[in-house]
């Protein structure tokens, strides 16, 4: 709802469906949003028919019985075949085989660099762990850091998972040595003043202004850089996406993905209209 084109999008949907759609903006704070949606669904609140949920909510809610199965109405076989089958099975199919979500968005946690800083310190590529470490050392100092992040408690897992993947670990198996190596690497960046410890309080709202101010030489971020574009900082000679480095040395590169799904509240009194939407 914060997108400047949202009102136009909503009008197009209403014109196409003939529906009168009342929109309630979700809380922007992730904890508050999770609590609100959980309360609505768990109490059988029928005031909201369709909710757009993220991956965390999908994992929490898919076996709760709070969401309507959509196999025979929206997510029919011809529609299901258009999506990655592993994603459908793992993220939006409940224990009884009911598909409870309609994918509406997917994105990825891309690696970004500040090209001005790279040029300044003479780093031409960040392809390996060794390249990354050289950049950290060269770019850090005088209030600037080679790497920046958003490590607030509800955000930190994104980058933890990303570094674990880059080292060839498994976020779901903490017996693996690669996982511990990744966490040690992140701690070493803090100890070496290559990334700031105070970012444990930062969400993206706090991180992005620092990026635009040239405080960070590299970082991971979702989306296409809208905040950087608005600040005049997006471009091949400024802030831009780059290939994620191969830390494992095995030629493997990995990124974290995310998604949003439309779900139908099983308590809804307007299921026919919701399915039309």
Describe each region flagged by the PLM.
Residues 1-66, 76-81, 125, 233, ...:
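Conserved N-terminal structural module of periplasmic/extracytoplasmic solute-binding proteins
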Residues 16, 25, 120, 192-194, ...:
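Extracytoplasmic/periplasmic substrate-recognition and gating elements
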Residues 17-21, 44-49, 98, 140-145, ...:
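Loop/turn elements at helix/coil->beta-strand transitions in domains of secreted/extracellular proteins
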Residues 34-46, 64, 117-118, 134-138, ...:
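Short helices/loops that flank or line small-molecule/ion binding pockets
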Residues 53-57, 204, 220-226, 259-260:
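Beta->alpha turn/N-cap motifs
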Residues 55-109, 133, 159, 236-244:
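Hinge/lid segment of periplasmic solute-binding proteins
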Residues 109-113, 262-264:
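Short glycine- and hydrophobic/aromatic-rich loop-to-beta-strand nucleating segment
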Residues 133-140, 172-200, 244:
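Glycine-centered hinge/linker elements that transmit conformational signals in sensory
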């Amino acid at each position: 709802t914060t997108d400047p084109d949202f009102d136009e999008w909503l009008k197009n949907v209403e014109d196409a469906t003939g529906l009168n759609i009342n929109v309630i903006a979700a809380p922007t704070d992730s904890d508050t949003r999770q609590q609100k949606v959980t309360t609505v669904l768990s109490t059988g609140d029928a005031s909201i028919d369709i909710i757009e949920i993220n991956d965390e909510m999908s994992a929490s809610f898919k076996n709760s019985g709070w969401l309507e199965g959509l196999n025979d109405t929206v997510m029919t076989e011809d529609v299901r075949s258009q999506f990655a089958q592993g994603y459908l099975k793992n993220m939006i199919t409940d224990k009884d085989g009911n598909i409870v979500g309609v994918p509406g968005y997917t994105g990825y946690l891309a690696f970004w660099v500040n090209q001005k800083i790279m040029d300044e310190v003479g780093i031409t590529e960040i392809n390996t762990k060794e390249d990354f470490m050289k950049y950290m050392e060269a770019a850090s100092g005088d209030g600037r850091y080679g790497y920046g992040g958003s490590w607030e408690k509800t955000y930190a897992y994104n980058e933890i998972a990303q570094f674990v993947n880059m080292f060839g670990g498994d976020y779901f198996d903490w017996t693996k040595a690669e996982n511990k190596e990744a966490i040690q690497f992140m701690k070493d960046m803090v100890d070496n003043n290559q990334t700031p410890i105070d970012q444990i309080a930062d969400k993206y709202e706090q991180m992005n202004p620092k990026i635009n101010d040239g405080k960070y030489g590299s970082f991971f971020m979702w989306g296409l850089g809208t905040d950087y574009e608005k600040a005049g900082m997006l471009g091949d000679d400024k802030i831009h996406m780059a290939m994620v480095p191969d830390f494992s040395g095995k030629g493997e590169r990995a990124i974290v993905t995310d998604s949003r799904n439309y779900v139908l509240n099983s308590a809804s009194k307007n299921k026919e209209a919701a399915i039309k939407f």
